[in-house]
């Protein structure tokens, strides 16, 4: 699935940068088209392996009033109505990615009204995608988990610049100069057109 993901994403969710969408999908469903996640109650003992099996399970969960997420982007069942999804279409990879793009783009456009910095707005949008709130996704660790899927490492801790007595430790005179640090967060920078991210 991962080998096909870039092509599907470019066709079905072109307004979300592939790096962002890939990190999101890896965390949400591990790129499993038929993934079903139970939010409350006992989790599925095994995941469905066919579209028919996934549809049958989803219909049973809805019948029982179970709160669950489905498909590549783990779209919550409570959002299916306004996204035009059902127990069959939610497991179509293209339709599911379109829905994920719709949710994320909506969150991002609203986050931009609160955050002038586009990367901060992006993180707030990820929080919104998970919780419907710009802050709870930070508190529950979701945002950091998605960032980790993007391969972004936490930078080394630095001593406070306010303490003038602190001096950098000299390891060796022959030590090569370190490379400049990359920007925090995503290494790609979005532009405001439709939640698209571009490389520096």
Protein language model features and the residues they cover:
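A short gly/proline-enriched turn/hairpin at secondary-structure junctions
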Residues: 35-40
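Eukaryotic N-terminal accessory cofactor-binding modules
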Residues: 44-45
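Conserved hydrophobic/aromatic packing and binding residues within compact polymer-binding modules
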Residues: 24-25, 129
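Non-catalytic cell-wall polysaccharide-engagement segments
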Residues: 2-19, 31-32, 48-69, 73, ...
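A mature extracytoplasmic/lumenal domain signature
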Residues: 25, 74-79
């Amino acid at each position: 699935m991962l080998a096909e993901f870039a092509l599907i994403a470019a066709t079905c969710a072109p307004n979300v940068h592939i790096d962002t969408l890939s990190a999101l999908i890896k965390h949400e469903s591990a790129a499993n088209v038929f993934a079903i996640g139970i939010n409350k109650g006992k989790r599925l003992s095994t995941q469905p392996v066919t579209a028919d099996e996934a549809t049958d399970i989803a219909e049973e969960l809805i019948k029982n009033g179970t709160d669950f997420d489905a498909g590549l982007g783990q779209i919550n069942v409570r959002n299916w109505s306004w996204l035009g999804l059902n127990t069959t279409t939610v497991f179509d990879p293209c339709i599911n990615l379109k829905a994920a793009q719709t949710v994320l783009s909506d969150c991002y456009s609203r986050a931009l009204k609160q955050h002038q910095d586009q990367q901060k707005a992006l993180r707030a949008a990820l929080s919104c995608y998970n919780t419907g709130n710009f802050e709870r996704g930070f508190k529950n660790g979701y945002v950091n988990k998605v960032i980790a899927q993007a391969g972004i490492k936490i930078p080394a801790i630095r001593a406070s610049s306010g303490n003038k007595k602190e001096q950098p430790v000299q390891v060796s005179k022959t030590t090569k100069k370190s490379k400049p640090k990359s920007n925090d967060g995503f290494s790609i920078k979005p532009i405001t057109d439709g939640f698209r991210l571009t490389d520096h």
